From Swiss-Prot:
Entry's family note: Belongs to the RSE1 family.
Record bears the keyword Nucleus: yes
Protein name, per record: Pre-mRNA-splicing factor rse1
GO cellular component: a single term: spliceosomal complex
GO annotation (BP), single: mRNA splicing, via spliceosome
Nucleus among keywords: yes
Length: 1225
């Protein structure tokens, strides 16, 4: 397969995966505070929990460009800092540390032990670390185990030994943990099955008799050798191990979790067993056994406990009682094992208990949760079951025990962290008529599923909204003295006057402030140590601390049209075009500079920068004129008001703002001039602090209204508030320091300013029509806003109404009782027992029952009602599997909703009692559905599509065309076009692209005259297709179950032959090639994403931009592929990729090129995620790479962040947000 391509795409992640595969806890910063490290796909993220506010904030995130299989934290004895061990697919063990001063991960050790990739005999699947940090064991699923001794050298640096082998061939490992043995030789416990005899026995008897063993491996530190110390049979269904505290804290050993029971085991102790309690209720099956799927052990002073979770989400508190000696001291001998119901939380992939009294739940599906412990469940009335009442003998079954689930009593939910995992389907539509479309998704599972609206923006918290007596034109806040912490006044300017409000416990009008109330205000500033100034059209009022006022009147027949101020300088522009400059003297008076500067046109705006630390003045004044220019004037005493530079603009400037902001290119701060134009365009340009030259201009269109700019403070950093038809915030990314421009999720404002009070330390005050609004921005780390609407069951497909802003979602849950069955069981229970407790399914899930399906169709209104407005339940154990909106020509092109269902479907191995195609008519503008009829088919119709006024259905391997009849669908044409199962359909004209579950895509042409379907081209590679979209008439983009994205194109000759007029006889009789179609598709691009693509869209994310491909992944990933338009850009990014891969290789040791070529060589794709790692590099590395590429650092960063414009097309991504956060939509 050729790896070069004549087509290149730039692959970029808009939102990284939100599914957390593992989370660990530790003091990674070396302080007493605990941090959480999570693995999401290839992303490693460290989070800071805030116990005072009950919030979790991500600090730093890095793509390791590899599959993170397992994580573990460890601490060397005597140290205060935890290190992180990563088990990945690189065939290497990686030890990293978090460096808080640089806010980055630093790799300490990288030791190779085997082949790369996820293989059953290459260690990396299991990782266990001795609690004292002396050794770690990394193991594979089968055979291989390696022990590394961890120590420190004379320089107190972490060292790692050569690996010690503990291999055992033909042995499968199910779980592994380290024992807590204090400072004795480290011991590791594993659940193993030896399959050597079963492998040689064709009768299967050896397999039936095979035992699962709990095995101890001891590392002898003296002999530097690993021995298999102890092995004992355990329950064959055992699947998890949990470490029991040892030494002075407990008896050591492990908890072995199996189906329906938990057993305490240790080599020198008796076994103790308790059953896992089962739910009791009208809809619960009392015979269903539970298993433990997650858990956590927490040590407190003098005590410890476990929280173990079943597949229902129920948490059980498990404790161990120990025997006491005559003095009442614990002996370390176990007396009993106890278990009781604690609370119910979402099913977790990881559970973490923080020392500050919080529980972190990394959910398997849906949002992650952060709980606070209200109590530990010691004094409640829950029944406690202990091992004294149950036999420890494995051959004797435990009697089942039951508990009654209830609402949360011990845990209080304090924060929910958004997660799109699993993301099933999406649509990209601009329903709000914003400047960018919204992404609508269906995600989650069971009763915790949701329909979500994603849009680009920052979340705003409104504090106050107050109506004013008339419409103000501007608002300011000011302190009374420089030393004040909070603002004292809000000044409102009206067309005929000025209103001053004092800020205190209440906001009220004040009149004795010295401000002129009979004229509108142009600027307000706290000047010097303790004075104020007010600029109005007729002059400048300098209000001293004792309320004395010095007035500077404007010259006769002239007025002030613009003003700029800082704490020491004032500049005003007169209607005659003159600039008058004032500077504060040593005695605190405002002195006018002798000369005035005459500008060539009318001045529209001015700006003075802040006075730098240790300086007495800002060096430059920016002047915007109506001749569409911006001039930089010097304010130095030697060259006051001299012209330093000029920049021509496309429109007259409406606002200017000089401010110093963080700069990713230099690592420090840089002076920028922000420019707003009357045309709605915003520009940001670098202002040289020495020469005053303007360079490196970036542009963005913000809206139809003139842009106004205001300097504000958000989360401790200086930012620019840009107001046009909607508000925007320009700020520095927390991680990369790159400039980001993001819209605010707020009403359009006419004016804005900083606001600081005791109640709102960092806020903003704004004007919207006749309203005064005070608001704040809480988070800068997430700029994708989500609105969520709960759904009933796991969504399978979504569809937008052809005309109305409504969505239709088909949902189905396997092994779940249908609503009708649940209602019947509850009624029966009420008749027998009276009142029945029905638990909310969003917290407790639906009752399970093997072989049952719960399925429905829901209509969602995301704009007006923002809720599900109608639900149609499917009966007779049918499960909805596909959906399409089809206009039928035979019904005057009326559009019907067509839903495909499967009856009595079994997922694995796949089987069903056939399928049905339901027809629904849209009523009430799509808000209701009227059932027409349903047609039985032999297999579930997994793909449906409207095609030339009829219905195209993929049923098994058969492609079929139906028309609408009175009582059922009428079969018009069919052909077997694929070898296995049709899972997707796309069409343009008479061409149909058919996706097969495991044989990629096949192009089929429909010949109308002869009413036949003819496959004429297919793929040379078997791809397990999950989603496809037609990019053009000959090209298809697709994704597969192994995480690949690809683009295939039909050969031009085959395409032309298929479109020739006539019967297509030559296509029918053309000889097939290798049991397939006569022709093969050409592969254009191919890359590996590490997430399963669930939907693909050809769309525009910027109004007027060129088409790009947007894809969504199962784990919540949203990414895009942007086509390159120039070979020069391709060459630049290919060279940058190579430099980055060699200068900063991936953290976990995986080779980047091999990673992106996991199943097939990467072709025609530039990895934008790797390119954006450039932002995170130290400055010296940036400069070294820039020198290799013969470019400047700023030029490279500009290339990465500002995608190319070509022949007048709109910039695809302007000031793109680094992928470490999220891309601008």
């Amino acid at each position: 397969m050729a790896t070069t391509s004549n087509m290149f795409m730039y692959s970029l992640t808009i939102q990284p995966p939100t599914a957390i595969t593992q989370a660990i806890l530790g003091q990674f910063a070396g302080t007493k505070e605990q941090q959480i490290v999570t693995a999401s796909g290839s992303k490693l993220t460290i989070h800071r929990p805030d116990p005072t506010q009950g919030k979790i904030t991500p600090i730093y995130s890095q793509d390791v460009f590899g599959i993170i299989r397992t994580l573990a934290a460890f601490r060397l004895a005597g140290s205060s800092k935890d290190y992180i061990i990563i088990g990945s697919d690189s065939g290497r063990i990686t030890i990293i540390e978090y460096v808080p001063s640089q806010n980055r991960f630093n790799r300490i050790h990288l030791e190779t032990f085997g082949k790369s990739g996820v293989r059953r005999v290459v260690p990396g699947q299991y990782l266990a670390v001795d609690p004292k940090g002396r050794a770690c064991l990394i193991a594979s699923v089968e055979k291989n185990k390696l022990v590394y001794v961890l120590n420190r050298n004379s320089q107190a640096e972490l060292t790692i030994s050569s690996p010690l082998e503990a291999h055992k061939p033909q042995t499968v490992v199910f779980a592994m943990t380290a024992l807590d043995v204090g400072y004795e030789n480290p011991i590791f416990a594993a659940l193993e099955v030896d399959y050597s005899e079963a492998d040689q026995d064709p009768t299967g008897r050896a397999y039936e008799e095979s035992e699962k063993l709990l095995v101890y491996y001891e590392l002898d530190l003296g002999l530097n050798h690993v021995v298999r110390k102890w092995a004992d049979p355990v329950d064959r269904t055992a699947s998890m191990l949990f470490q029991v505290p040892g030494g002075a804290d407990g008896p050591s050993g492990v908890l072995v979790c199996a189906e329906d029971n938990i057993t305490y085991r240790h080599s020198n102790q008796d076994a103790f067993r308790v059953p896992i309690p089962r739910r009791i209720g009208a809809t619960e099956n009392p015979e269903r056994k539970r298993s433990i799927v997650a858990g956590v052990m927490h040590k407190m002073r003098g005590a410890f406990f476990f929280l173990l979770q079943t597949e229902d989400g129920d948490l059980f508190k498990v404790t161990i009682d120990m025997v006491e000696d005559d003095n009442g001291q614990l002996t370390g001998e176990v007396k009993r094992l106890k278990i009781k119901y604690f609370d119910t939380v979402p099913i977790a992939s990881s559970l973490l208990i923080l020392k500050s009294g919080f529980l972190y739940v990394a959910s398997e599906a849906g949002n992650h949760h952060f709980y606070q412990f209200e109590k530990l469940g010691d004094d409640d009335e829950e029944t406690e079951f202990n091992s004294e009442n149950f036999p420890a003998d494995l051959s004797v079954p435990c009697e089942p025990v039951f508990f009654q689930p209830r609402g949360a009593e011990n845990l209080n939910l304090v924060e929910t962290l958004n997660s799109l995992n699993p993301l099933i389907d999406s649509k990209i539509v601009n329903l709000n008529e914003d400047d960018a479309p919204q992404i609508y998704t269906v995600s989650g599972s069971g009763a915790r599923s949701s329909f979500r609206t994603l849009k680009h923006g920052l979340e705003v918290s409104e504090i106050v909204e107050s109506e004013l007596p008339s419409v103000p034109s501007a608002v300011w806040t000011t302190k009374l003295t420089r030393a004040d912490e909070f603002d004292a006044y809000i000044i409102l300017s009206f067309a005929n006057g000025t209103l001053v409000l004092s800020i205190g416990e209440t906001v009220e009008e004040v009149t004795d402030t010295g401000f002129l109330s009979t004229a509108p205000t142009l600027a307000v500033q706290q000047l010097g140590e303790d004075s104020l100034i007010q600029v109005h059209p007729r002059g400048i009022r300098h209000i001293l601390a004792d309320r004395r006022v010095n007035e500077w009147p404007a010259p006769q027949h002239r007025s002030i049209v613009a003003a700029a101020t800082n704490e020491r300088q004032v500049a005003v522009a007169l209607s005659s075009g003159e600039i008058v400059y004032f500077e504060m003297d040593a005695d605190g008076t405002l002195a006018e500079y002798d000369e005035r500067r005459q500008m060539s046109g009318t001045v529209t705006c001015l700006s003075l920068g802040e006075v730098p630390e240790g300086r007495v003045r800002s060096s430059f004044l920016a002047v915007g004129c109506d001749d569409s220019t911006v001039r930089i004037l010097s304010l130095d005493p030697d060259s006051t008001l001299e012209n330093k530079s000029v920049q021509a603009l496309t429109s007259a400037p409406s606002a200017l703002n000089i401010m110093s902001m963080a700069d990713s290119s230099s690592g420090g701060t840089t002076l920028y001039l922000h420019i707003g134009l009357y045309s709605g365009v915003y520009l940001r340009t670098v202002l040289d602090e020495v020469t005053g030259e303007l360079s490196d201009t970036r542009t963005r269109f913000l809206g139809a209204k003139p842009v106004k700019l205001f300097r504000v403070s958000v989360k401790g950093q200086t930012a620019v508030l840009a107001l046009s038809s909607r508000p925007w915030l320009g700020y520095s990314d927390i991680q990369t320091k790159g400039f980001m421009l993001t819209p605010l999720d707020y009403v359009g404002l006419e004016w804005g300013w900083n606001f600081s009070s005791e109640q709102c330390v960092e806020g903003m005050v704004g004007i919207q029509a006749q309203n005064l609004r005070i608001f704040s921005i809480e988070k800068l780390d997430n700029n994708i806003l989500q609105e969520s609407i709960p759904l009933s069951n796991t969504p399978r497909r979504m569809l937008k109404h052809p005309e109305q802003p409504l969505f239709y979602v088909i949902e189905s849950d396997n092994n779940v009782l249908s609503p009708a069955t649940r209602a019947r069981l509850i009624e029966d229970s009420k008749a027998r027992n009276g009142e029945t407790n029905v638990l909310p399914p969003e917290d407790f899930g639906y009752p399970r029952a093997t072989g049952h399906w719960a399925s429905c169709i829901q209509i969602v209104d995301p704009l007006d009602a923002k809720a599900v407005i109608s639900t149609i339940e499917l009966e007779e154990n049918e499960a909805a599997v596909s959906m399409a909106a089809v206009p039928f020509s035979s019904q005057d092109d009326e559009t019907f909703l067509v839903v495909g269902t499967a009856k009595d479907m079994i997922v694995n191995p796949p089987s069903s009692a056939g399928g049905f195609i339901h027809i629904y008519r849209f009523q009430e503008d799509g808000k209701e559905l009227e059932f027409i009829h349903k047609t039985k088919v032999e297999e579930p119709p997994l793909a449906l599509l409207g095609f030339q006024g009829r219905l195209l259905a993929g049923i098994g391997s058969t492609l079929r065309i139906y028309d609408l009849g009175m009582k059922q669908l009428l079969r018009k044409c069919q052909a077997q076009v694929v070898s296995k199962t049709i899972v997707g359909l796309q069409t343009q004209g008479s061409r149909i692209v058919v996706s097969d579950v495991r044989e990629s895509v096949t192009y089929v042409v429909y010949k109308y005259q002869d009413n036949i379907l003819i496959p004429f081209v297919d793929d040379s590679v078997s791809r397990w297709t999950t989603s496809t979209t037609m990019v053009d008439y000959e090209t298809v983009a697709g994704g597969d179950k192994f995480g690949n994205l690809w683009l295939v194109r039909c050969p031009k000759k085959a395409s032309e032959e298929a479109d020739e007029d006539g019967s297509g006889a030559h296509l029918i009789h053309e000889r097939g090639y290798l049991h397939g179609a006569p022709n093969r598709l050409d592969l254009m691009i191919h890359t590996y994403t590490q997430d399963i693509p669930t939907s693909l869209h050809k769309t525009q994310l910027v109004a007027g931009g060129r088409d790009i491909l947007v894809w969504t992944g199962f784990q919540g990933t949203i990414g895009m592929l942007v086509p390159f338009v120039s070979r020069e850009d391709v060459d630049f990014f290919q060279n940058l990729e190579m430099q980055l891969a060699s200068q900063c290789p991936p953290l976990a040791g995986r080779d980047h090129l091999i990673y992106r070529s996991y199943y097939a060589p990467v072709k025609g794709v530039i990895d934008g995620d790797l390119c954006e790692m450039y932002f995170l590099l130290p400055n010296d590395t940036k400069m070294m790479i820039a020198a290799e590429l013969d470019r400047s650092v700023r030029e490279i960063e500009r290339k990465i962040s500002v995608r190319y414009a070509n022949e007048g097309s709109v910039l695809i991504i302007l000031m793109a947000i680094p992928a470490s956060v999220c891309k601008g939509l």
